[in-house]
Amino acid sequence: GGKYKEYQTLCENYACAKLTGATEGLVNFEDKPFKAYLNKKMSKRAKLNIAHGALNFIEKTFRPEALPQLYDMAAFGRSLIAIPLKNGTCIDVKLLASPFQEEGELMLLMFLGDRRVYSICFSCTADGQAWIGGIQGGKDIDNEEVKALTKELYGIRPKNLIITLLYGFLSHFNIKEIYAIDSHYHVKSERVKTSYSELWLEIGGEKHRRGWYKLPPSEIKKSLEEVKSKHRSQFIKREGLKELAQLDLAAALRDICVKRNG
């Protein structure tokens, strides 16, 4: 139809579509409406609408010189920030054109040295929506290490930290309408080991229709009054770390994004 023709023209002209096409292993933008994308029960029309919005978001958000860095698969994209740990090391946060395009065009990753701790894949549209298609812990980090890392982060679990980072990313672009996939509707649901719904509910999500959860427009925060007095200093450090990470992230995004009005 007309919308697909217009979309095809954008795919032929946009730098991000060309980079996606030139990067080994990535699904071409033109093929997205016809392939597995975000939700295995989604119609071609719904896929086209999101892919069209995502194409515009990426092309119009990132500076032309920053775009190729996002597609540098060997380097896992562009480093954004470092989050300091208690022991003096840090977690590196990167933004990458997602190697799993079917879970969304963009991926935020957390690394400890050269090991991936957590990653989340998502699509953002030019009209202010986000669609989260996958979240995954690192294969070379075991449960004991996750526990140790949680201690180093004043009690923040790595998967909650990546959610905080995603919220920081989305709020920078004023994206408030956020949907997250139910693992049963994940494009490769047979390979998903964990139940996503538990996490979406824990962070305040509500069951939406057709395999989606709708997440709160911004991260829900506990207030100090809700925390037992003996845990308060830890809580304050935790919140401080999250807040600083989001501020650093916003500054890093300003470096790679086109200046927006307003």
What are these regions (language model features)?
Residues 182-241, 245, 253:
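Active-site/acyl-donor-binding loops of N-acyltransferases
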Residues 1-149, 235-262:
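Non-catalytic substrate-recognition and accessory regions of acyl/acetyltransferase enzymes
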Residues 117-118, 123-207:
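Acyl-donor binding region in acyl/amide transferases
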